UniProtKB/Swiss-Prot annotation:
Gene: hisA
Keyword set, alphabetical order: Amino-acid biosynthesis, Cytoplasm, Histidine biosynthesis, Isomerase
Protein name: 1-(5-phosphoribosyl)-5-[(5-phosphoribosylamino)methylideneamino] imidazole-4-carboxamide isomerase
InterPro entries xrefs: Aldolase_TIM (IPR013785), His_biosynth (IPR006062), HisA_bact_arch (IPR006063), Isoase_HisA-like (IPR044524), Isoase_HisA-like_bact (IPR023016), RibuloseP-bd_barrel (IPR011060)
Matching HAMAP family: HisA
Catalysed reaction equations from the record: 1-(5-phospho-beta-D-ribosyl)-5-[(5-phospho-beta-D-ribosylamino)methylideneamino]imidazole-4-carboxamide = 5-[(5-phospho-1-deoxy-D-ribulos-1-ylimino)methylamino]-1-(5-phospho-beta-D-ribosyl)imidazole-4-carboxamide
Catalytic residues (positions): 8, 130
Organism: Chlorobium chlorochromatii (strain CaD3)
Pfam families registered for this protein in UniProt: His_biosynth
GO process terms (BP): L-histidine biosynthetic process; L-tryptophan biosynthetic process
Length: 257
């Protein structure tokens, strides 16, 4: 199971929200690139970045910060948040982002996905489905789609999408455990590669998700649980923090040259 640390960027800072509520914002670091390096030191193999400002406005105001992250780590970076055009996708891929996530636009403008799949490889474009009780939520989770989550996934599959990032928003940022049953139901019906998200609290959640591998769930995005140091191994990493540089043998990470 690939564990993907999440970095949410708001006003240029690394933050975490609770259930997507901007009024419940906690700032963890002023420089998101520093956060990326910390996760890489702890042997992250991929990073999940969300531009919260872009999600609100559609403007890529944090692209410089994201570019800095890409330049400073030697692992793939996937980016989502307010991506609504081919030009936006191109801009991210041009700075070295490995994978771009289409969210609300998959519902409001499915032709965008169709166009992107004619231009880019399936490995470069994924769709994020944020669902509540099986219904996709869009536009900052303020509106509901008129179809079920798995129905949206199957439409995307027909267009060539191979992977879905599936978030149970009732669990997101709540530290109440992964939405195991909702993720299982979705993965069974979609029949696609699935990255789970929302609610991971501790290692027991990760062990539970291992049971969903046969349904295509092969990775998980972890946010607040990592930031709140809910995993015992993090105590080891942080106890040696002053001695570990990005290119130190203690980590498999290597600084980009």
């Amino acid at each position: 199971m690939l564990i993907i640390p999440a970095i949410d960027i708001k006003d240029g800072k690394c933050v975490r929200l609770t259930r997507g509520d901007f009024s419940q914002k906690k700032i963890y670091l002023d420089n998101p690139s520093d956060m990326a390096i910390i996760w890489r030191k702890q042997n992250a193999k991929m990073l999940h970045i969300v531009d919260l400002d872009a999600a609100l406005t559609g403007e890529m105001v944090n692209i410089a910060a994201i570019s800095d992250i890409v330049a400073n780590v030697d692992i793939p970076v996937q980016v989502g948040g307010g991506i609504r055009s081919v030009d936006a996708v191109k801009s991210y891929l041009d700075i070295g982002v490995a994978r771009v996530i289409i969210g609300s636009a998959a519902v409001t403008n499915p032709k965008l996905v169709e166009e992107l799949m004619h231009i880019y490889r399936p490995s470069q474009i994924v769709v994020g489905i944020d669902a509540e009780n099986g219904v996709p939520k869009i536009k900052g989770w303020l509106e509901s789609a008129t179809m079920q989550d798995y129905e949206l996934a199957l439409r995307m599959k027909e267009m060539g999408i191979e992977r879905i990032i599936y978030t149970d928003i009732t669990r997101d940022g709540m530290m109440q455990g992964i939405g195991y049953e909702s993720t299982k139901r979705f993965a069974e019906k979609a029949g696609m590669k699935v990255t789970a998200s929302g609610g991971v609290t501790n290692s027991s959640d990760l062990h539970k998700l291992e049971g969903l591998r046969r349904y295509g769930v092969d990775s998980v995005i972890v946010g607040k649980a990592l930031y709140e140091c809910n995993f015992p191994c993090q105590e080891l990493w942080y106890s040696f923090e002053d001695e570990i540089s990005i290119d130190h043998n203690f980590s498999t990470a290597r600084q980009k040259s």
